[in-house]
From Swiss-Prot:
Chain sites annotated for binding NAD(+): G188, S189, P190, R191, V192, G193
Modified residues (N-acetylmethionine): M1
Locations listed in the record: Cell membrane
The protein's name in its UniProt record: Aldehyde dehydrogenase family 3 member B1
Main location: membrane
EC number: 1.2.1.28, 1.2.1.5, 1.2.1.7, 1.2.1.48
Residues the record marks as active site: E210, C244
Enzyme class: oxidoreductase
Domain of life: Eukaryota
GO cellular component, one term: secretory granule membrane
Record's comment on post-translational modification: Dually lipidated in the C-terminus; prenylation occurs prior to, and is a prerequisite for palmitoylation. It is also required for activity towards long-chain substrates.
Catalytic reactions on record: an aldehyde + NADP(+) + H2O = a carboxylate + NADPH + 2 H(+); an aldehyde + NAD(+) + H2O = a carboxylate + NADH + 2 H(+); a long-chain fatty aldehyde + NAD(+) + H2O = a long-chain fatty acid + NADH + 2 H(+); a medium-chain fatty aldehyde + NAD(+) + H2O = a medium-chain fatty acid + NADH + 2 H(+)
Native source organism of the sequence: Homo sapiens (Human)
């Protein structure tokens, strides 16, 4: 008995039968996802609160609404995205039809994380279904309440001949990766991303890896400290800091640090009250393993704000660390929690040099009243995404691709980028079976005159020819 193998064979048979290709079928699956979100909103909010202590506001803004927006966008543009894309032609192909056809890969695997267990599961799923693929979904076993809904409720809204949910932990995921897929989409840590990529390489399966890293946040001396504090605190402590694009550390001068600390303290009190543990707006650490890891990081540098913790509640207070050394553990790993180290630099040049000697981050932030400073940080660094004078607001635009570079990942998605990620872009040229005299230039015996004429025909419209 091989239940998993049987499931994968069933899905492949459905794909090869052409079931997922029609626009009507794809639209029906997307509509089902939309109904799932609408009809189970409270159930999803409750599950997110149980798993991560997410407030209704955070759940709606960062999970349900974003997922619903992707569904709506895909439904509105599906037929336009599916259309063949006409391309320029050279003189030799003026009478032919040249286009790019967007084809589904086939059977795709989506492995989702626990920190945004709805958003980071459904947003890639929208792209995979819109592109006409059959999908195996592997939600995180760590966010167990959301996992239960995705396994038991979601399949009621989509065609189960083309969709399956696989449950389990690392062992089951490893078994899943032994099978051949046509595309793998993974969101998680760089360590596990390497395991996924190694497994995919055995079958030459293409992958998207949405990983993480240490996202820098540079703060210029000319900034208003309260404005910076408001924006940095909001996106550092959102979801208790368990966000892959959250700022992982602040780079600023000692003078700015002195102005920024009281502003951050004021903001944290305004956001979460005198007792943040009792605030309904502050999440909790997902499990004891992550809690213990984060509590150990509180010993790095010096605690300037916060630092309290409660193991029984998996609570870590919004914390700011100062006097942090570059080689301390808090600066050697992605924090993924409500802890914000401040690292002092003496100049913009030093900040840029500090950023560039580390792995390329998933996101990079620069605060300055000078647009030239922001543009200089943008120009002289590299990251998956960039935002000037705010936090992860670039994530709210489906018109911008989301993805990493280097150690923070490969590939991109959101909006049409998701559709393109899950589509094979097939180069197509349809020629006439007649008019053979027009092809005589390319046949032997060749001559200098024929060569000149052929090159002219091939180079028209700026095209070139590559023969492998």
């Amino acid at each position: 008995m091989d239940p998993l193998g049987d499931t994968l064979r069933r899905l492949r048979e459905a794909f090869h039968a052409g079931r997922t290709r029609p626009a009507e079928f794809r639209a029906a699956q997307l509509q089902g996802l939309g109904r799932f979100l609408q009809e189970n909103k409270q159930l999803l909010h409750d599950a997110l609160a149980q798993d991560l202590h997410k407030s209704a506001f955070e759940s709606e803004v960062s999970e349900v609404a974003i997922s619903q927006g992707e569904v709506t966008l895909a439904l509105r543009n599906l037929r336009a995205w599916m259309k063949d894309e006409r391309v320029p032609k050279n003189l030799a192909t003026q009478l032919d039809s040249a286009f790019i056809r967007k084809e589904p890969f086939g059977l795709v695997l989506i492995i989702a994380p626990w920190n945004y267990p709805l958003n980071l599961t459904l947003v890639p799923l929208v792209g995979a279904l819109a592109a006409g693929n059959c999908v195996v979904l592997k939600p995180s076993e760590i966010s167990k309440n959301v996992e239960k809904i995705l396994a038991e409720v979601l399949p009621q809204y989509v065609d189960q001949s083309c969709f399956a949910v696989v449950l389990g932990g690392p062992q089951e995921t490893g078994q899943l990766l032994e099978h051949r897929f046509d595309y793998i989409f993974f969101t998680g840590s760089p360590r596990v991303g390497k395991i996924v990529m190694t497994a995919a390489a055995k079958h030459l399966t293409p992958v998207t890896l949405e990983l993480g890293g240490k996202n820098p946040c540079y703060v210029d001396d000319n900034c208003d400290p309260q404005t910076v504090a408001n924006r940095v605190a909001w996106f550092r402590y959102f979801n208790a800091g368990q966000t892959c694009v959250a700022p992982d550390y602040v780079l600023c001068s000692p003078e700015m640090q002195e102005r920024l600390l009281p502003a951050l303290q004021s903001t944290i009190t305004r956001f979460y009250g005198d007792d943040p543990q009792s605030s309904p707006n502050l999440g909790r650490i997902i499990n004891q393993k992550q809690f213990q890891r984060l509590r150990a990081l509180l010993g790095c540098g010096r605690v300037a704000i916060g630092g309290q913790s409660d193991e029984s509640d998996r609570y870590i207070a919004p914390t700011v660390l100062v006097d942090v050394q570059e080689m301390e553990p808090v600066m050697q790993e992605e924090i993924f929690g409500p802890i914000l180290p401040i690292v002092n630099v003496q100049s913009l040049d030093e900040a840029i040099e500090f950023i560039n000697r580390r792995e390329k981050p998933l996101a990079l932030y620069a605060f300055s009243n000078s647009s030239q400073v922001v543009k200089r940080v943008l120009t002289q660094t590299s990251s998956g995404g960039f935002c000037g004078n705010d936090g992860f607001m670039h994530m709210t635009l489906a018109s911008l691709p989301f993805g990493g570079v280097g150690a923070s990942g490969m590939g991109r998605y959101h909006g049409k980028f998701s559709f393109d990620t899950f589509s094979h872009h097939r180069a197509c040229l349809l020629r006439s079976p007649g008019m053979e005299k027009l092809n005589a230039l390319r046949y032997p015996p060749q001559s200098p005159r024929r060569l000149r004429m052929l090159l002219v025909a091939m180079e028209a419209q700026g095209c070139s020819c590559t023969l492998l």
